[in-house]
Amino acid sequence: MDLLSCTVNDAEIFSLVKKEVLSLNTNDYTTAISLSNRLKINKKKINQQLYKLQKEDTVKMVPSNPPKWFKNYNCDNGEKHDSKLEQKNHIPNHIFSDTVPYKKIINWKDKNPCIVLNEYCQFTCRDWSIDITTSGKSHCPMFTATVIISGIKFKPAIGNTKREAKYNASKITMDEILDSVIIKF
């Protein structure tokens, strides 16, 4: 049991955690473990406060192991942002810097990017979807596919068929993600 856990109430812990999160730089993130070590407060209590801050839209969480918490950039301006989707270029690069075994990356080499994307998201415990929109005339439509991983939108891709658009969007997304992953040999 930590010393501060006995003497500090939830409101004080909430303000301490909020202060720590709001002091993060643009490309920084934190975890409940690091906050617990820094503040000398029980990790369970830190997690409770982080989830309260998430409901307030003060912090964003990317599910990983352990979850990574970062400041909601709209809090700097005092504005609230209704959309739960963020563009990839507004998210720090380290959010997708997971450690992936070398064998897994070699196995992914010749696979369809949609399959690779699915396996990556299963491996990192993230949810994902592909949003497809249609444009153009009905006799020659163009399809735009956008991959969304844990609420983060990646660059869209265009195709003449839905399958081609999904393939292109998955390829672009996996290329971006594989550039930032840490390979474990």
UniProtKB/Swiss-Prot annotation:
Name-wise, this protein is: Protein E3 homolog
Supply the domain comment.
The Z-binding domain recognizes and binds Z-nucleic acid structures.
- What is an annotated GO biological process for this record, any one? symbiont-mediated suppression of host cytoplasmic pattern recognition receptor signaling pathway via inhibition of IRF7 activity
The record places domain DRBM at: 112-179
Pfam families noted in UniProt? dsrm, z-alpha
Organism listed in the record: Yaba-like disease virus (YLDV)
At the top level, the lineage of the source is Viruses
Per the similarity annotation, which family is this?
Answer: Belongs to the poxviridae E3 protein family.
Q: Which residues form the signal peptide?
A: none
Q: Which InterPro entries match?
A: dsRBD_dom, E3L, WH-like_DNA-bd_sf, WH_DNA-bd_sf, Z_dom
The job of this chain, per UniProt, is described as: RNA-binding protein that plays a role in the inhibition of multiple cellular antiviral responses activated by double-stranded RNA (dsRNA), such as inhibition of PKR activation, necroptosis, and IFN-mediated antiviral activities. Recognizes and binds Z-RNA structures via its Z-binding domain and dsRNA via its DRBM domain: RNA-binding activity is required to escape host ZBP1-dependent necroptosis.
| The entry's keywords | Host-virus interaction, Inhibition of host innate immune response by virus, Inhibition of host interferon signaling pathway by virus, Inhibition of host IRF3 by virus, Inhibition of host IRF7 by virus, Inhibition of host PKR by virus, Inhibition of host RLR pathway by virus, Interferon antiviral system evasion, Modulation of host cell apoptosis by virus, RNA-binding, Viral immunoevasion
Molecular function GO labels: double-stranded RNA adenosine deaminase activity; protein serine/threonine kinase inhibitor activity; RNA binding
